[in-house]
Amino acid sequence: MSIVRMTDLALSGKRVLIRQDLNVPIDQGRITSEQRIIASLPTIRVALERGAAVMVTSHLGRPKEGVWSEEDSLAPVAKRLSQLLGIEVPLRRDWVDGVQVAPGQLVLLENCRMNVGEAENDEALARKYAALCDVFVMDAFGTAHRAQASTHGVICCAAIAAGGPLLMAELDALSRGLEHPVKPLLAIVGGSKVSTKLELLSNLVNNVEQLITGGGIANTFLAAAGYSIGKSLYEGDLIETAREIITAAKARGAEIPLPTDVVVAKQFLPGVTATVKTVDAIVADDLILDIGPQTARHYAALIETAATVVWNGPVGVFEFDAFSKGTEVLARAVAASSAFSIAGGGDTLAAIDKYGVADQISYISTGGGAFLEFLEGKTLPAVAALQARSG
């Protein structure tokens, strides 16, 4: 991917503005998950070690533009960065018109979404951001799908614009998994609705050899194949779309394997009785809440034969133990596989954490919406802007 990399630049004495994704959950001033802060540290350390005057900004929450809000302030992030880096990290509240920072120093610039014009990618604001630095570094993959002043406009205006190590690692992994995958490529797509992942399914079916579905998505595909699904979650208005996706897969020799057995209950509640049934034995008041053991074994065998695996979404209601076995079997199969594996999406990350397999997945994307849009085959605005500047 043709993008100027921060690690290839001479940064000594340069003013470097880094856009990170430090949008961490905060409860009563306490950071409850510092994963994104930890992920940002290598980029910051490289810039400091190379003698740059480093400025970092990020969004946090959804503040009203032009209004400072303590609830959405990066103050807790500045404090935690100071502790992790072992240096003072001052927080600058009013920074758009200029920042004092010396080589070897780091300042955190207050929540960029508080700046008027940020969300609509205002050119005047983007130019002010660009004027702050000699080098702008985009390192926030999680916001690369948003064309905003700090993620897109400034890339177009800055003297030099580069991709940071975190962003480039994400793009390199996604490119390896989707744009230039070693075949066979298998994708797992779970979730409640076909409608939210329709573009994803339509794009993947043109690239994969196997497309495993789970959750409400699988129920819609079962209904499209003529099976009764009782009162299970599905989308009746997308049955024809599901049939078209199945037809498209068959036309290029790909397969969308359907469950042969499922785990059902009469109510969607923890502690209810779970029953394994074949898919042709579903009755009117059944709720399908997981794939069955026979299906899980079959899917695990398919994963074992894949050279590349892309995973987005669980295949059952894994939050309830009675309906978690399918997702667990697949998670462990992906972990045990010799394939290059990429996983992303909030529920997927929660499943990976639950089963303790994070260190056995080749790459775990923290990108959320950006990860999904990349899987859909969309061009991410920040990435497109960086590519345009590389020429």
UniProtKB/Swiss-Prot annotation:
Extract the PROSITE patterns matched here.
PGLYCERATE_KINASE (PS00111)
Q: In which pathway does it act?
A: Carbohydrate degradation; glycolysis; pyruvate from D-glyceraldehyde 3-phosphate: step 2/5
E.C. no:
2.7.2.3
Question: What is catalysed by this protein?
Answer: (2R)-3-phosphoglycerate + ATP = (2R)-3-phospho-glyceroyl phosphate + ADP
Q: Does the keyword Kinase apply?
A: yes
Where it sits in the cell: the answer is: Cytoplasm
The residues that hold ATP are: 197, 319, 345-348
**Gene Ontology CC entries for this record:** cytosol
**Residues at which substrate binds:** 21-23, 36, 59-62, 113, 146
Keywords, A to Z? Answer: ATP-binding, Cytoplasm, Glycolysis, Kinase, Nucleotide-binding, Transferase
Q: What is its main location?
A: cytoplasm
Q: Which residues form the signal peptide?
A: none
Asked whether the UniProt record includes Disulfide bond among its keywords, one would answer: no
Family listed? Belongs to the phosphoglycerate kinase family.
Q: How does it assemble?
A: Monomer.
PANTHER family, alphabetically?
PHOSPHOGLYCERATE KINASE (PTHR11406), PHOSPHOGLYCERATE KINASE 1, CHLOROPLASTIC-RELATED (PTHR11406:SF23)
Stated name of the protein: Phosphoglycerate kinase
